[in-house]
């Protein structure tokens, strides 16, 4: 459920998710996470995985650009994680607006403290669109954010760019490549039966 904010029509998503669950299909929700506790409580039992877009750790950014607030988004992310859903976080890096290293590190620290080092973080490049005319995110900014976040999180990825880093899934213990990615090509290269081929650590991947 994605590409428009699905929780605008939360009743529709709930109906579809229930039907999908009856057919043994997985429900994956991509959302900005701006939802109150009670409706989230009702729908989360039917959701298998979420990607939550935390746009900045600066509440002023949310109020200026999103006309909303940061706290409800963080509360939902924690609620989703505590409910047992698989949670991943995305942060769109926008030059001059939310690319400050201190703010980026605050996000990684919050994820690590509240959900653990194993929660994946996707750092995505911004592109000019509609009324937002700032220049596209430089690769250097994303790679700098990657280095900052990797101090706190084991799985950090770069999105919307071609980069030598932040593409593959690597074993946190030995550094071996578990899943290699090139564009939309994805190959399980270093894991077998749920374990790293090199060090035999159990991999943090859900296989279905």
Predicted feature residues:
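Auxiliary Fe-S-binding modules of radical SAM enzymes
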Residues: 96-208
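Conserved AdoMet/S-adenosylmethionine-binding subsite of the radical SAM
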Residues: 1-137, 145
């Amino acid at each position: 459920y994605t590409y428009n904010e699905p929780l605008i029509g939360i009743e529709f998503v709930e109906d579809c998710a229930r039907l999908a669950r009856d057919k043994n299909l997985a429900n994956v929700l991509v959302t900005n996470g701006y939802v109150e506790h009670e409706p989230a409580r009702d729908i989360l039992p039917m959701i298998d995985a979420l990607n939550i877009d935390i746009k900045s750790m600066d509440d002023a950014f949310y109020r200026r650009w999103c006309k909303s607030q940061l706290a409800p988004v963080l509360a939902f992310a924690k609620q989703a994680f505590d409910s047992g859903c698989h949670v991943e976080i995305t942060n769109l890096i926008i030059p001059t607006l939310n690319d400050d290293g201190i703010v980026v590190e605050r996000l990684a620290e919050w994820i690590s403290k509240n959900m653990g080092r194993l929660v994946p973080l996707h750092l995505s490049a911004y592109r000019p669109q509609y009324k937002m005319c700032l220049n596209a995110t430089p690769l250097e900014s994303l790679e700098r954010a990657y280095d900052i976040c990797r101090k706190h999180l084991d799985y950090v990825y770069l999105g919307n760019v071609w980069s030598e880093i932040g593409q593959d899934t690597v074993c946190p213990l030995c550094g071996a490549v578990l899943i290699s990615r090139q564009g939309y090509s994805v190959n399980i290269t270093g894991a077998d039966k749920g374990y790293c081929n090199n060090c035999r650590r159990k991999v943090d991947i859900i296989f279905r």
